[in-house]
Amino acid sequence: MSSLTMAAAQQVGVEAKIDSVAIMIGEQAHLQLAITARQGAKIVYPHYKRSQYLVPGVEVLDDSKGDTAVVDGYWSVKKILTLTSFDEQLYAIPGITVKVDGKSYKSNPVALKVI
């Protein structure tokens, strides 16, 4: 897990978005994890290794460092996972857990169809 000291978590948001709901076998999709928290909190998010499976059948090709910005006293952290799969299937990717000041927050689940 990577750790970043950031915002005191009164209002915390964790959202997952995927840039393609369907890809061809071997193509890439990008899953963006967006975290919002008050400045000063400690944010801990998962770190994935190259070739690690996010879920069985969906492989992580790249795990970007968190890109941070300050907006109205809140940290906005964006992290991108580059994914691929070599099996034709509809995959349900569960919410990703992030800790803010020791409290767990989970993103929304996303789906990826490989055709």
Tell me what each language-model feature is.
Residues 7-115:
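Surface-exposed interaction/ligand-binding surfaces
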